[in-house]
């Protein structure tokens, strides 16, 4: 059994279970900007592939699947000793432009992903809160 820690509780789960949990936070409207979302998810699909290949595959899938996809930024970064990649891109849903800022953090057995979803015009209004949250993100060691 493995200890699993939630914000509200701790529990033990069988070792064979795979964590696919998602944490969703709503950012309040800020000035003229509408609400945004900040999501933390886990993805075990990296497998044995190099992290760069995993990120390239994720980017390729987004490009194929998201209408009006446009990549704005791709930065290789390091978060407390973990390889990470920041992607800023936009796409269209129901005729509306959406802006995503994703950070992929290598942490086996699952990549940790943070996603800020807003609009291109609203990003500057939500960016300070996003930066503040991300500066406090410290990946925990992988349980043995």
Swiss-Prot record:
Alphabetized SUPFAM superfamilies for the sequence: Mog1p/PsbP-like
InterPro entries listed in its UniProt record: DcrB/EagT6 (IPR014894), Mog1/PsbP_a/b/a-sand (IPR016123)
Alphabetical list of Pfam families matching this protein: DcrB
Domain of life, per lineage: Bacteria
Function according to Swiss-Prot or TrEMBL: Plays an essential role in toxin Tse6 delivery to target cells and specifically in the loading of Tse6 onto VgrG1a.
Subunit structure: Homodimer. Two dimers interact with Tse6; this interaction is crucial for Tse6 loading onto VgrG1a.
Protein name: Effector EagT6
